[in-house]
Amino acid sequence: MNQLSGKIENIETKNSLSFVSIKVGTATLFAIVMQTLHNSPHLKIGNPIQVIFKATEVIISTGLVDHISLQNRLAGKIYTIESGLLMSRLLLKTEIGMLISVIPTVSVNRLELKVDSEITAMIKANNLILIK
């Protein structure tokens, strides 16, 4: 599980969906939550917030990633790789700190990932969980 500390920068709400912008270090992450300002008092601009997401929800790419709908894209390098028969655990050094990604070992091999490989870590906005 990945957990980051941030600060809410902006909130756009329509019906029961809120699109929340969170400043984490030098980057801005985006979350889509099925909560509104009325039932989630912690969702206020300027409030500190914890951003949580599973390691299996961190997508890894090599090379440029310009034409993709994912908004949460973080440049980084692979710090360590622990490869198992089916799955591999990657520790990533990104602009907002260390992240963990768990991806299929076959993908590690296909992408030729190694320690110090430059990567882009991506997380879908609806996979971010926001807590106080």
Indicate where each model-derived feature is located.
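Glycine/charge-rich catalytic "coupling/switch" loops of P-loop NTPases
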Residues: 2-5, 10, 35-73, 77-80, ...
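Short, conserved beta-turn/loop elements at beta-strand boundaries and strand-helix junctions
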Residues: 11-17, 81-87
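Short, acidic/hydrophobic/Gly-rich beta-strand patch recurrent on exposed beta strands
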Residues: 19-25, 32, 89-95, 101-102
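A generic beta-sheet turn/junction motif
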Residues: 15, 24-26, 53, 85, ...
